[in-house]
Amino acid sequence: MKQPALDPDVADVAPNDSVLTTYDEEHLVTYWRLLDAEADGAEWKEVARIVLHIDPDREPARARHAFDTHLARAKWMADHGYRDLLRGGAIK
């Protein structure tokens, strides 16, 4: 696995696979930032703007959906996906 980007742009929808994906590897920092923001009680619109690079005032539905799916994926990574990382990463 190569080092993930520190502030990558995101897709409109996070993966929903039952295994770690290349996208997940590329967005590890994004996932950790989302989990940190949730733990800190940050407002979702601020997180969408800063972490996901989507303006929730201009694109509210897109921003909310991207936020929800990426946060769900971040939680999946913390609970399950990390095991795939320990085994060597995404299946190529």
Question: What is the meaning of each model-derived region?
Answer:
Residues 1-18, 91:
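Basic, low-complexity segments
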Residues 33-34, 57-80:
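Major-groove recognition helix of helix-turn-helix-like DNA-binding domains
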Residues 14-16, 70, 85, 89:
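Bacterial C-terminal helix-turn-helix
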Residues 76-92:
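Intrinsically disordered, low-complexity basic tails/linkers immediately adjacent to helix-turn-helix/homeobox/MYB/SANT
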Residues 18-24:
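A detector for short, charged/polar N-terminal pre-domain segments
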Residues 24-40:
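Short, amphipathic alpha-helical "recognition" segments used to contact nucleic acids or chromatin
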Residues 13, 50-62:
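Short helix/strand-capping connector loops at secondary-structure junctions
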